[in-house]
Amino acid sequence: MSDSLRIIFAGTPDFAARHLDALLSSGHEVVGVFTQPDRPAGRGNKLTPSPVKVLAEQHNIPIFQPKSLRPAENQAMVQALDADVMVVVAYGLILPQPVLSMPRLGCINVHGSLLPLWRGAAPIQRALWAGDSETGVTIMQMDVGLDTGAMLHKISCPILPQDTSATLYDKLAELGPRGLLETLELLADGSAVAEAQNDALATYAEKLSKEEARLNWQLSAEQLERCIRAFNPWPVSYFTVDEQPVKVWKAEVITTAHSTLPGTILQADKQGIQVATAVGILNIQELQPAGKKVMSAQDLLNSRREWFVPGNTLD
């Protein structure tokens, strides 16, 4: 391989840890890891380290967990590591300009979309919900904007009709490390070419909210089915019936035309619970009532058939 690089890695969740793992298996030297402070998690609200911290500890890499990189003393932590490049993957903190300029080759970021599409916090989910036919990862040179830096490398993959955010996440978690290592090779031997983003083509992937997860029957069946896949595994689409929230994990589109009020139950049997939408019918196949496990429509009908009487409406 080309010359070994001294790398600072900054990341927090599992998606980031998979990239750190790839770096640790390469010929590069990870001289320090920045990750978010431990957070309360689980039933006992016990302080829990991030997946990136756990991996760094296993490899005895120096770990830094500042709450912010704005204070000069925290920026000095970065400077002292004398890195060639800083690799940032789902870190969760803003990098001020002084930090971006510290490593010899600057800071690069792995982003889960084909930039300039879906800049922002939830690119995987937004691409799926929008009905895009493909997505991918972009490795970019970071600047102070929100995912606006020049692009160094892209890898794309198709979005399949059955993909959920969970399955796309796994695909991109495989593509990202590969693209990262290829980009580092180009940076190390001086052959990387940076391509400016076309801001006119930019779209924004706002963070998901639980409020968005409520199924809006005024949308088409196609839109709702994509919403269900985009919000799997979090926050999970839902409707309410008898004032009870019911999560929806799987559904299919029936293109049959109808003139029924959206949200009306048309049919409920072992094939699913068919609900009228603005365009077409949504056939709900897997559901989860509050406090229960995920179950088939048939299993839920066995215990709660009164919830799904044809002619009734869902909220």
UniProtKB/Swiss-Prot annotation:
* Signal peptide residue numbers: none
Keywords, A to Z, come to: Protein biosynthesis, Transferase
* Pfam families (alphabetical): Formyl_trans_C, Formyl_trans_N
EC number annotated for this UniProt entry = 2.1.2.9
Q: Does the keyword Transmembrane helix apply?
A: no
Question: At which positions is (6S)-5,6,7,8-tetrahydrofolate bound?
Answer: S113, L114, L115, P116
A GO molecular function annotation here is: methionyl-tRNA formyltransferase activity
Query: Looking at its record, which EC class is this enzyme?
Result: transferase
Task: List where the protein spans the membrane.
Answer: none
| Catalysed conversion reaction | L-methionyl-tRNA(fMet) + (6R)-10-formyltetrahydrofolate = N-formyl-L-methionyl-tRNA(fMet) + (6S)-5,6,7,8-tetrahydrofolate + H(+)
Q: Which GO terms describe its cellular component?
A: cytosol
Which CDD domains would you find in this protein's record?
FMT_core_Met-tRNA-FMT_N (cd08646), Met_tRNA_FMT_C (cd08704)
Task: Kindly give the InterPro entries that the UniProt entry links to this protein.
Answer: Fmt, Formyl_trans_C, Formyl_trans_C_sf, Formyl_transf_N, Formyl_transf_N_sf, Formyl_transferase-like_C_sf, GART_AS, Met-tRNA-FMT_C
Tell me, in a sentence or two, what this protein's role is: Attaches a formyl group to the free amino group of methionyl-tRNA(fMet). The formyl group appears to play a dual role in the initiator identity of N-formylmethionyl-tRNA by promoting its recognition by IF2 and preventing the misappropriation of this tRNA by the elongation apparatus.
Assigned protein family: Belongs to the Fmt family.
PANTHER family named in the record: METHIONYL-TRNA FORMYLTRANSFERASE, METHIONYL-TRNA FORMYLTRANSFERASE, MITOCHONDRIAL
What the entry lists under NCBIfam families is as follows: fmt
Q: What is this protein called?
A: Methionyl-tRNA formyltransferase
Species annotation: Pectobacterium carotovorum subsp. carotovorum (strain PC1)
